[in-house]
Amino acid sequence: MKAAIAQINTAALRHNLAVVKRHAPQCKIIAVVKANAYGHGLLPVARTLVDADAYAVARIEEALMLRSCAVVKPIVLLEGFFSAADLPVLAANNLQTAVHTWEQLEALEQADLPAPVVAWLKLDTGMHRLGVRADEMPAFIERLAKCKNVVQPFNIMTHFSRSDELEQPTTREQIDLFSQLTAPLLGERAMANSAGILAWPDSHCDWVRPGVILYGVSPFPNTVAADYDLQPVMTLKTQLIAVRDHKAGEPVGYGANWVSDRDTRLGVIAIGYGDGYPRMAPNGTPVLVNGRIVPLVGRVSMDMTTVDLGPGATDKAGDEAVLWGEGLPVERVADQIGTIPYELITKLTSRVFMEYV
């Protein structure tokens, strides 16, 4: 019997892609599958999202894995290439690349490639992490437009820094700046991330780039996927391996950081930080057992976690426990732990069995 299982609902993946299309019906879709498809499995997810127009990854290794498994649709490297030595690999595998530094531009100009590559000029409109600044743009695009190793016209993209904060003016300012800077350019444009797709329709350009919403996670604080008709794709579950009577005044686990104030029954579930469940999960973090929410108690161990089933509980070893997913939104769990759902879903270890349904 497998201990920890991440059940991946492929029908939910397709449903969430349909939600994206409903919000941006005139746009082409770049499905973001970086970081092992946000922890959901790169190849199975890409194969499920066959109705996307392209894929985006962060690392060239991810792109090459897709190509080696007969994925032929366009693939965009969101961070671009890291070395001039990568360029022949990009050209040979028909990979598209972001371009955001002078060093990348110089490498493109000097390369000897069998065919030009599709390039996405990444503009810094306010994220201030990657991208060409507005004052650098005229000189940069003059050279990029003349580069023999770039398919012309080149495309343009940017990335939002606060699109999940609807009350902040930053996203509006980024949209306006990007629109102004790119108005004279002929290439295709991409602005909208997950939050942009749902909340900022003015950011819908030729392309949109859904990420976390494809996996049934809300990009906004204090909300859950269902608020936007999204369905959770990952359900992380395990089983009770022991049910024990526990007396008032007794602690449980390393460090004795939880002491029961009543006689109760505790359940031990087969998951821990060795599986990627966060050790920092505090007492009270919700776990779903037999259809009801019970609190995590005691410190998360490498292989086990303890929950308070309550006095007189009839749960037994072998019963299912859900850590997040169907019936227990990952957003709620992340809030309790003090992190973001992105971190939870991307940090599962290889010990967790991936089950696709």
Curated annotation (Swiss-Prot):
GO terms for cellular component: cytosol. Substrate binds at residues 129, 302. One of its GO terms (biological process) is D-alanine biosynthetic process. Pfam families: Ala_racemase_C, Ala_racemase_N. It is an enzyme of class 5 (isomerase). Its cofactor is pyridoxal 5'-phosphate. Gene3D superfamilies: Alanine racemase (3.20.20.10), Lyase, Ornithine Decarboxylase, Chain A, domain 1 (2.40.37.10). The keyword Cell wall biogenesis/degradation does not apply. The active site is at residues 34, 254. Its EC number is 5.1.1.1. Pathway: Amino-acid biosynthesis; D-alanine biosynthesis; D-alanine from L-alanine: step 1/1. Keywords: Isomerase, Pyridoxal phosphate. PROSITE patterns: ALANINE_RACEMASE. It catalyses: L-alanine = D-alanine. One of its GO terms (molecular function) is alanine racemase activity. The keyword Transmembrane does not apply. The modification N6-(pyridoxal phosphate)lysine is found at residue 34. Catalyzes the interconversion of L-alanine and D-alanine. Likely plays an important role in supplying D-alanine, which is an indispensable constituent in the biosynthesis of bacterial cell-wall peptidoglycan. Belongs to the alanine racemase family. PANTHER family: ALANINE RACEMASE, ALANINE RACEMASE, BIOSYNTHETIC. This is Alanine racemase. It comes from Aeromonas hydrophila subsp. hydrophila (strain ATCC 7966 / DSM 30187 / BCRC 13018 / CCUG 14551 / JCM 1027 / KCTC 2358 / NCIMB 9240 / NCTC 8049).
